[in-house]
Amino acid sequence: DMRENITRRAPVRVIEEFGIRVARPGSDVTIASCGRMLHESLAAAALLENQHGISAEVLDVRILAPLDKKTLLQSVRKTGRFLVVQEECAHGFGAYLVATVADEALEHIQARRILILGTPCAFAPPPRFWHFHVPTASLITAQVHTLVQE
């Protein structure tokens, strides 16, 4: 049996909190991300604050099911603008977050659109092309600046 050959080990760190964590409070725009894109989003939030005076609230989406709608919607209602940053294709977890915001907080959106930054194709590109597709802090900053100016 294959299961007998699998070594089980304790997790390095137990995550006690699930849902969405406000990684950086802000008031002008909500940026939702997870994993590696959280670090790019935090870097972009610092650039936005320092260079443009834009206060970005960054959400760390740690689990989707069940979705922490309360934290997500509270942030979007406060800022009025919403951007999802993800590494995967644009149809990934961001589409679920955008649908939730559109269903339950659309009247609070001040911008003409809600953005998803991610790979614009149905499949992930080969690793040597990732730098063309993965959102960076500068790309996030440019998109948020455009979103706030609308």
Predicted segment positions?
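Thiamine diphosphate
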Residues: 1-150
